[in-house]
Design a protein with these regions (language model features):
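Residues lining hydrophobic/aromatic ligand-binding pockets adjacent to catalytic sites
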Residues: 1-240
Length: 240
């Protein structure tokens, strides 16, 4: 039986295709035990203000943990979450809108601080929940790489092979960046099929899914994403 997997680092409120690939796969592995990357999307994302201007929404990182793996990185002790919450809601014009979603997001940031990885993972799981509206049949199996493979790998593609083997997956779903930065021959030698999903529609690769929810509403975003997911599953089957 063919099983597809999407393997990705835990980004902070990432863009919609991140979730499209998750929901189009049988398994999602959160790559949380690789090195944190400064100035990446591990601790920041982009939103647009009421005038359509882009701005960074960042969680400030404790400098002492910046060189560690993602699951060891923490946010600054003096980070004022409530102040940031009000600032973001004012900039985006959502101070009196999307109260349930805003409350849930900031509650997760508060509850799982100071660990960046834990915050990101819980936010990803929350977004998956509201997109699927609790429909468990749509959701993939979710694993953390730190729980199923504790070895530190010098070769990142061999790491993927081991994760695929540990979850009994024989097909890996990749976006353009992953496809170009891995040794595809190693995957093929280990009989792992590769699906390049570079059909990112009209989504801006920098903009958070939260921005789309603010602009179009969760029902419209959910409908759009699930429609693409259904197309993807057919597309993936043909590519396996």
């Amino acid at each position: 039986m063919t099983r597809s997997v999407m393997i990705h680092q835990p980004h902070f409120l990432p863009w919609p295709p991140y979730f499209i690939r998750i929901l189009s796969s049988d398994v999602f592995i959160i790559l949380d035990n690789v090195t944190f990357q400064k100035d990446s999307f591990h601790n920041r994302t982009i939103l647009t203000d009421i005038n359509g201007k882009e701005f960074w929404f960042s969680l400030p990182v404790n400098h002492k943990t910046r060189t560690k793996t993602i699951n060891q990185v923490t946010i600054c002790e003096n980070f004022q979450i409530d102040k940031m919450n009000k600032s973001i809601c004012t900039k985006t014009g959502t101070l009196k809108k999307y109260n349930d979603i805003n409350f849930a997001i900031w509650d997760i940031i508060k509850q799982y601080s100071p660990n960046i990885s834990e915050i990101n993972i819980k936010l990803i799981e929350y977004i998956i929940d509201i997109i699927t509206q609790g429909n468990e049949s749509i959701k993939p199996e979710i694993y953390r790489s730190s729980k199923i493979d504790k070895k530190i790998w010098s070769n990142k593609t061999e790491h993927l092979v081991n994760l695929c083997n540990n979850t009994k997956c024989d097909t890996i779903v990749m976006g353009k960046y992953s496809y170009n930065c891995h040794d595809l021959n190693i995957l093929k030698e280990n009989e792992i099929n590769i699906i390049l999903d570079d059909r990112d529609m009209s989504y801006n690769p920098k903009i958070s899914i939260l921005d789309y929810i603010y602009r179009y509403g969760i029902d419209n975003v959910s409908k759009s994403i699930l429609s693409i997911v259904n197309e993807n599953k057919f597309y993936y089957e043909r590519r396996k």
